[in-house]
Amino acid sequence: MEADDDFYSGTENYSDYADSDEDDADGEYEFVDDAADDSDDLIFRRRQQNYSVLSEADICKLQEDDISRISTVLSISRNSSAILLRHYNWCVSRVHDEWFADEEKVRDAVGLLEKPVVDFPTDGELDCGICFETFLSDKLHAAACGHPFCDSCWEGYITTAINDGPGCLTLRCPDPSCRAAVGQDMINLLAPDKDKQKYTSYFVRSYVEDNRKTKWCPAPGCDYAVNFVVGSGNYDVNCRCCYSFCWNCAEEAHRPVDCDTVSKWVLKNSAESENMNWILANSKPCPKCKRPIEKNQGCMHITCTPPCKFEFCWLCLGAWTEHGEKTGGFYACNRYEAAKQDGIYDETEKRREMAKNSLERYTHYYERWATNQSSRQKALLDLKKMQTDDIEKLSDIQCQPESQLKFIIEAWLQIVECRRVLKWTYAYGFYIPDQEHGKRVFFEYLQGEAESGLERLHQCAEKELLPYLDAKGPSEDFNEFRTKLAGLTSVTKNYFENLVRALENGLSDVNSHDAYDRTSSSKSLGGKTKGSSSKASSSDSSHWPCEYCTYVNPRSTTICQMCEHGR
């Protein structure tokens, strides 16, 4: 079974994929117009229907829209509207429900008074309620309650609250017996400029941190937030900073693996369990002090490190003073061999062998997981370089507008995405139960095909593009390269999307035993025949197995749902 034949047939027409890919391009990618943020160098980003990425300006606009809506509907000031929305976590519908159900209760809860508690005269002299000094009325201010305090005391009170953190957003009157709210209008009037900025920052952040539909991007240094349609199924989010993460668990994006598996895998990578496995597999405890010792030389004579300094035989762990010619020499131990034949060391050796096998298995999956991660990071750097430097250079050399070269950016975006998916398939494979051997074999087959296809795309985008970047002028075969790369991008994208769906469904639609039998037989025979396919399909009238990838499809379909080859 040739990998090329499995990923796409020898008669595949790349131009068909290129045409369809260009037709779909406007639906999948859009230009990012971010003139307000010069640090955002992305040319394209994927358009997702279940979330939107928000800058600080976007958040402020959403806040203003919500405040205006509440102010209009409830006929209250914008300042009071902001206090209400903050109290109800920026949920407009909840504000409406609570307000119209019991306005008096809501006012009492948030500190919105209908009339002052005390009269505040506009002229004359008054005593400050904090420092008890006497001031002219124009040197004192009060919240809606009317309790007067001098400007200096207000400033100290507000500054202390702001320096204490976001709790300043629920600031109340300094009078201990009063619960009147102190809104942003008072902050802007009385606080120093630096405190105003800090308060505004807390206010903007509250829209994200108190809103269950909005989260900050977890990437270090990123100031974007994401507004998500909860319940949309796919939790993967791509921020404008190029970081992809899972909305549900806030780890990096990890489809097709679920959040629980990711949690276990990340914990396993950082836990001491694999250290213990390595110790069990590669060391033995000193018979005296029990410290683990790794044997790094050929002699069986082991001396423990100070202060223990116990000398013992590596094979039987007996004292070295009891060894010599009578035990078979210094490089053998007939005492150990005899004990092993009697079964004394069976359990210890079995435990060590199990630890070694477990470690080797984990290492196999982890190394490939980490390799794809590093490949993805390199692809991200190549993508950025392509966007900032190479596209403009290629446009000049090939005399084509940059808009006609976006197929290259799309190829690199697909490579980055596929590297991420492929990375997490190794975590998926690690947790496939041992008893599901057929499913494991079929999974490894699909994974191998995915790797093969991705390598072809990566090779084309990375290596085959170089001659066109180094050319002195327009290349006659550049359009052929465009067709090939666009075709590879489309085919790879389709395969990986189908792979993700299949793995997320737990390969539930796949007849594992049939997949294993067909894969094994095709490998042994060096190919596949239509006769074997008809036999397999005749055993189940409601499904048919694909000759290329062995996926079992419903009888009603004529194209394989996994690899998209015809029936």
UniProtKB/Swiss-Prot annotation:
MF terms in GO: ubiquitin-protein transferase activity; zinc ion binding
Cofactor: Zn(2+)
Name of one Pfam family that matches: IBR_1
Pathway the protein takes part in: Protein modification; protein ubiquitination
Binding site for Zn(2+) 6: 313, 316, 323, 333
Active site per database record: 299
Zinc finger feature spans (IBR-type): 197-259
Gene3D superfamilies, per the entry: 1.20.120.1750, Zinc/RING finger domain, C3HC4 (zinc finger) (3.30.40.10), Zn-finger domain of Sec23/24 (2.30.30.380)
Key word Transferase present: yes
Keyword Glycoprotein part of the UniProt annotation: no
Main enzyme class: transferase
GO biological process: protein ubiquitination
Amino acids binding Zn(2+) 3: 217, 222, 239, 241
Protein name as it appears in the record: Probable E3 ubiquitin-protein ligase ARI8
Organism: Arabidopsis thaliana
